[in-house]
């Protein structure tokens, strides 16, 4: 129902979702015919709640904005996080003055009044493979971003609703005093959040090994809390009722502290219902109990399954339920078979379309360590650090040692395969067939057929992704910068022109933009290496993420204009990779020739240090279409190209993001392109593309597409279907 109301974007998706809903309701009525009226009422409630949550309330700018100290972060005199404007949750950001930080450190809620603000709709993903933050925040009932330019702080008295947020903030500061790895596990287990970017490498390691669910996603630690309280109650000779009440009260508090994290709520609801059925002496199967947990969770949160963590948490528990009679190894295989289709779709924010075929082995080895060492030790540290701070001298070496071991194994990439992205229909097909394979009786012939179907499906999908029938030229939307992917069909060759990147003006290093945009874009297509990367010039918006690229994906050759190696800034980016990648300096007249594609260099004519006027300029032909790329080359350079080459092209990437310093009218007249492309950022401070350039295009009747408006722009060609141009953001074909 959540999918029908909130996620389905095509008739096919609505049809499949309705079909599953009908089957689900039919099974419920078949099993519980006497309760058909209750089932109908439940469906009515869920439908109503879904539509209520879909409704958008109008923001009343000017009303006070309420901010809780545990929901915002301050960095480099800048704050960002979540706030509430009347009944609407919003993302907020602004400059953090001294009075703001002072009030924030008091833990209680603060009100912002008399403010000036700019309200924006949260942008959806504008690149294939990119995580969609618009959908993510919609699952948290957040649709708007409020950028504060000025504000005043209005003091208010503490209310009962403030206490949970105050306790969360207190625990955040409490954990902040712990060493890095102890802090990491304590925050994940209690608050269901990672407090620091310093632990990004460890999270990536858990992801690559396929054991990310061991953290807060699965809610495994709830059973440890319950066992701890029961043991304490037994030691204190409390009655069963008193122990149950303590468990329920503790779990409710922890649900609030975890900010209603789906895995924790799921595990807690399971305990609540178990207690209820036991006290009422109602016999119910574990499968039916899981169904009741799901339904009650959905009533509580109709947007539940917009959350990837919720999908994985329930899928894991469902897998445990249908494989409860299997051995440990076979059960691990079942769990990974169910989770894999989800991880290859774009539901999951940190997976990037890669799977590890040794995940079963890693789970078999690491789960016992996690359950019997990490979880109990975290539990002990959390509750004893306040009175025995020296305990971290014991815990930190253990946590660090296990983290180092995890990072070491992950760095080896044993079993890790970049599979690529599958679509929603393929995901459903794989899940359904896998479930039937698991739950059907032992019909050997039927099971053999189902196994063959699953294996055949995965193999077919893999080959279609890795040996595509079409090639492409894709202008990746990296904001104010350039990054263009070029691939050939079948025995695919992959080339990148520039990497994109941003200047870092803050004190702290930010995660490279490449990790959020370019790598997911590549991995979604199953691209795990690049045959060559062409570097136009030294600017950060063109090659700022080069080091991050070389650190994470194999590159065979780096092509650049001769003289760039004399630039120390450039050499810093490639130091440490000189043994792994071949450097190829180029000048006008040089040719980079491969079996399927040849790049001709038309600029520069002399070595330089990589300034705009030294931009490497390339032309090549794909499917009888001539392309030209000139980096940030100015008009003087364009005239030099005119003087040496009589170029006419079909497609041209406009120089310098559409700046008036490039795109000379005479140059464009000579090129006579049927379409030009502009790569520029939204609301960029340079005003690109300049109106003068757009007027030139209009005067010459040259149409254009801009990543600023269209997101990633992809030109595809195929021997079977000809050529097409698609724009990802608008989703249309031109």
What residues fall within each predicted segment?
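Membrane-interface helix/helix-cap signal primarily in integral membrane proteins
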Residues: 45-213, 516-525, 529, 563-566, ...
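Hydrophobic alpha-helical transmembrane segments
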Residues: 157-166, 184-197, 256-263, 281-288, ...
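Alpha-helical transmembrane segments of multi-pass integral membrane proteins
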Residues: 321-419, 674-679
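Aromatic-rich juxtamembrane segments at the membrane interface
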Residues: 143-270, 275-276, 532, 599, ...
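N-terminal leader/targeting segments
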Residues: 1-61, 173, 266, 443-446, ...
């Amino acid at each position: 129902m959540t999918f029908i109301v909130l996620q389905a974007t095509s008739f096919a998706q609505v049809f499949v979702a309705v079909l599953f809903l009908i089957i689900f309701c039919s099974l419920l009525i078949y099993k519980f015919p006497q309760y058909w009226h209750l089932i109908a009422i439940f469906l009515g409630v869920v439908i109503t709640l879904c539509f209520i949550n879909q409704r958008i309330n109008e923001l009343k700018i000017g009303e006070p904005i309420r901010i809780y100290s545990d929901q915002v972060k301050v960095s480099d005199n800048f704050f960002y996080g979540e706030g509430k404007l009347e009944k609407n949750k919003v993302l907020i950001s602004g400059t953090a003055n001294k009075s703001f930080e002072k009030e924030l450190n008091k833990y209680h809620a603060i009100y912002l009044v008399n403010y000036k603000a700019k309200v924006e709709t949260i942008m959806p993903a504008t690149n294939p493979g990119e995580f969609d933050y618009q959908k993510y925040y919609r699952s948290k009932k957040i649709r708007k971003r409020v950028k504060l330019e000025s504000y005043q702080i209005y003091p208010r008295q503490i209310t009962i609703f403030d206490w949970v947020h105050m306790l969360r903030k207190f625990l955040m500061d409490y954990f902040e005093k712990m060493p890095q790895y102890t802090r990491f596990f304590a925050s994940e287990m209690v608050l269901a959040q990672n407090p620091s970017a310093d632990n990004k490498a460890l999270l990536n390691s858990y992801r690559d090994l396929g054991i990310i669910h061991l953290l807060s996603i699965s809610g495994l630690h709830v059973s440890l809390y319950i066992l701890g309280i029961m043991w304490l109650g037994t030691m204190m000779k409390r009655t069963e009722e008193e122990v149950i009440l303590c468990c329920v009260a503790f779990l409710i508090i922890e649900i609030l502290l975890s900010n209603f994290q789906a895995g924790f709520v799921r595990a807690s609801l399971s305990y609540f219902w178990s207690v209820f059925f036991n006290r009422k002496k109602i016999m119910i199967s574990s499968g039916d109990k899981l169904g009741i947990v799901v339904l009650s969770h959905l009533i509580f949160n109709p947007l539940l399954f917009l959350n990837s963590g919720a999908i994985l948490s329930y899928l894991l528990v469902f897998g445990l339920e249908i494989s409860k009679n299997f051995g440990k190894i076979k059960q691990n295989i079942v769990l990974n078979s169910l989770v894999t289709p989800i991880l290859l779709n774009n539901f999951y924010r940190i997976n990037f379309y890669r799977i590890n075929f040794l995940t079963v082995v890693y789970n078999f080895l690491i789960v016992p360590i996690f359950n019997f060492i990490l979880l109990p030790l975290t539990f002990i540290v959390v509750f004893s650090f306040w009175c025995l701070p020296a305990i971290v001298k014991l815990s930190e070496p253990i946590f660090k040692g296990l983290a180092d071991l995890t990072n070491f194994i992950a760095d080896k990439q044993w079993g890790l395969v970049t599979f690529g992205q599958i679509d929603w229909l393929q995901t459903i097909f794989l899940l359904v067939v896998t479930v039937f394979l698991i739950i059907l009786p032992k019909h050997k012939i039927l099971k053999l057929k189902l196994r063959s179907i699953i294996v055949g499906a995965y193999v077919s999908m893999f080959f279609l992704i890795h040996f595509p029938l079409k090639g492409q030229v894709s202008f990746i939307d990296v904001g104010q910068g350039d990054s263009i992917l070029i691939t050939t069909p079948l025995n695919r060759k992959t080339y990148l022109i520039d990497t994109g990147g941003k200047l870092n003006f803050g004190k702290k290093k930010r995660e490279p933009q490449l990790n959020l945009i370019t790598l997911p874009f590549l991995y979604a297509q199953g691209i795990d290496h690049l045959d060559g990367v062409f570097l136009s010039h030294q600017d950060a918006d063109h090659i700022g993420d080069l080091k991050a690229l070389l650190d994470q994906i194999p590159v065979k050759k780096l092509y650049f204009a001769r003289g760039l190696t004399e630039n120390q800034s450039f050499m810093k980016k490639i130091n440490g990779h000189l043994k792994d990648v071949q450097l190829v300096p180029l000048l006008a007249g040089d040719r980079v020739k491969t079996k399927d594609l040849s790049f001709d260099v038309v600029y520069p004519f002399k070595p330089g240090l990589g300034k705009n006027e030294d931009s490497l300029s390339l032309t090549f032909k794909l499917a009888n279409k001539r392309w030209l790329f000139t980096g940030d080359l100015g008009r003087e350079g364009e005239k030099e190209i005119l003087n040496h080459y009589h170029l006419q092209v079909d497609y041209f990437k406009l120089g310098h993001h559409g700046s008036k310093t490039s795109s000379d009218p005479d140059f464009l007249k000579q090129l006579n392109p049927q379409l030009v492309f502009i790569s520029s950022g939204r609301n960029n401070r340079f005003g690109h593309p300049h109106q003068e350039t757009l007027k030139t295009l209009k005067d010459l009747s040259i149409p254009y597409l801009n990543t600023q408006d269209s997101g990633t722009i992809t030109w595809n060609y195929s021997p079977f279907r000809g050529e097409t141009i698609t724009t990802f953001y608008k989703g249309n074909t031109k």
